[in-house]
UniProtKB/Swiss-Prot annotation:
Gene3D superfamilies (UniProt xref): Phosphoribosyl-AMP cyclohydrolase (3.10.20.810)
Location relative to the cell: Cytoplasm
InterPro entries per the UniProt record, alphabetical: PRA-CH (IPR026660), PRib_AMP_CycHydrolase_dom (IPR002496), PRib_AMP_CycHydrolase_sf (IPR038019)
Name under which the protein is recorded: Phosphoribosyl-AMP cyclohydrolase
GO cellular component: cytoplasm
Pathway participation: Amino-acid biosynthesis; L-histidine biosynthesis; L-histidine from 5-phospho-alpha-D-ribose 1-diphosphate: step 3/9
Length: 131
């Protein structure tokens, strides 16, 4: 990979120096999760080939899968037409992206009667993932 970081200057970072990131499973097109990256996280993600996010609550870099083993191997990075959203196509190791033990964080579906319904099963109990 190139050691140049000029490409990072093309990203439109928000007022907090962050960019929203959508993680999409490369093989299925499933949207797995939404998170944030700062400049260092995006650069290190590109360099290592593993997803590294910025945790807004903990105010530190977060290596996806560092506790669970459910790492995301980056297949492709894209940026939208306004350069302010990153799409990251990934291979989701272990098939679980969500801390709830589900494949995707988007496991609730809106129904016409005004309710949210859980439509994806828990694949592994979070207590077994994070113990």
């Amino acid at each position: 990979m190139s050691t140049s970081t000029k490409w990072l200057n093309e990203v439109k970072w928000d007022e907090n120096g962050l960019v929203p990131v959508i993680a999409q499973e490369a093989s299925t097109g499933d949207v797995l999760m939404f998170a944030w990256m700062n400049r260092e996280a995006l650069q290190r993600t590109a360099e290592t080939g593993n997803a590294i996010y910025w945790s807004r609550s903990r105010r530190k870099l977060w290596h996806k899968g560092e506790e669970s083993g459910h790492v995301q191997k980056v297949v492709e990075l894209r940026i939208d037409c306004d350069n302010d959203v990153v799409l990251m196509k990934v291979e989701q190791v272990g098939g679980i992206a969500c801390h709830t033990g589900r494949h995707s964080c988007f496991f609730q579906k809106y129904l016409a009667d005004g309710r949210w319904e859980t439509v994806e099963p828990v694949l592994k109990d979070p207590k077994d993932i994070y113990s």
